[in-house]
Amino acid sequence: MAALRYRRFLKLCEEWPVDETKRGRDLGAYLRQRVAQAFREGENTQIAEPEACDQMYESLARLHSNYYKHKYPRPRDTSFSGLSVEEYKLILSTDTLEEFQEMNKSMWKKLQEKFAPTRPEEKHKAWTRVLSRPRT
């Protein structure tokens, strides 16, 4: 029975798309990682809670098949903000979020990152130079 569960999860992982614009935050990539952890021994893995495993699979399968999208249809493909799905994908991409984080940095933080040494030994040398200067 564990082999059947393993094959079902593998099939779901194959069908689940991976969004390359969401590096490190994609549900498809996370799902593949969790299945690999849960089924370390492949088809020979012993499942401690088979009911919970089946329930998890059914929940993921409903999400993948857009069960709730069909059950609760929306009149338009927009949200309260009026943005389309493509616009949301652009905004939520990792590159755009990194740009927003860079924009939100203060001028002082940007200058620190630009001129601060990157290696720990360089930081130590910079501090010893500053501390060894005579104060006037």
UniProtKB/Swiss-Prot annotation:
Compartment list: Mitochondrion matrix, Mitochondrion nucleoid; Mitochondrion; Mitochondrion intermembrane space; Mitochondrion matrix
Coiled-coil annotated spans: none
GO cellular component terms, semicolon-separated: mitochondrial inner membrane; mitochondrial intermembrane space; mitochondrial matrix; mitochondrial nucleoid; mitochondrion; nuclear body
Keyword tags: Membrane, Mitochondrion, Mitochondrion inner membrane, Mitochondrion nucleoid, Transit peptide
Pfam families attached to this UniProt entry: UQCC2_CBP6 (PF20180)
Organelle targeting peptide span: 1-13
Main location, first listed in the record: mitochondrion
GO biological process terms held by the UniProt record: mitochondrial respiratory chain complex III assembly; positive regulation of mitochondrial translation; regulation of insulin secretion; regulation of oxidative phosphorylation; regulation of skeletal muscle cell differentiation
Superkingdom of the organism of origin: Eukaryota
Organs and tissues of expression: Widely expressed with highest levels in brain, liver, kidney, heart, skeletal muscle, thymus, testis and pancreas (at protein level).
InterPro entries reported in the protein's UniProt record: UQCC2 (IPR037698)
Function: Required for the assembly of the ubiquinol-cytochrome c reductase complex (mitochondrial respiratory chain complex III or cytochrome b-c1 complex). Plays a role in the modulation of respiratory chain activities such as oxygen consumption and ATP production and via its modulation of the respiratory chain activity can regulate skeletal muscle differentiation and insulin secretion by pancreatic beta-cells. Involved in cytochrome b translation and/or stability.
Subunit and partners: Interacts with UQCC1. Forms a complex, named COMB/coordinator of mitochondrial CYTB biogenesis, composed of UQCC1, UQCC2, UQCC4, UQCC5 and UQCC6; stabilizes nascent cytochrome b/MT-CYB and promotes its membrane insertion. Forms a complex, named COMA, composed of UQCC1, UQCC2 and UQCC4; activates MT-CYB translation. Forms a complex, named COMC, composed of UQCC1, UQCC2; UQCC3 and UQCC4; mediates MT-CYB hemylation and association with the first nuclear-encoded CIII subunit UQCRQ.
Protein name as annotated: Ubiquinol-cytochrome c reductase complex assembly factor 2
Gene (UniProt): Uqcc2
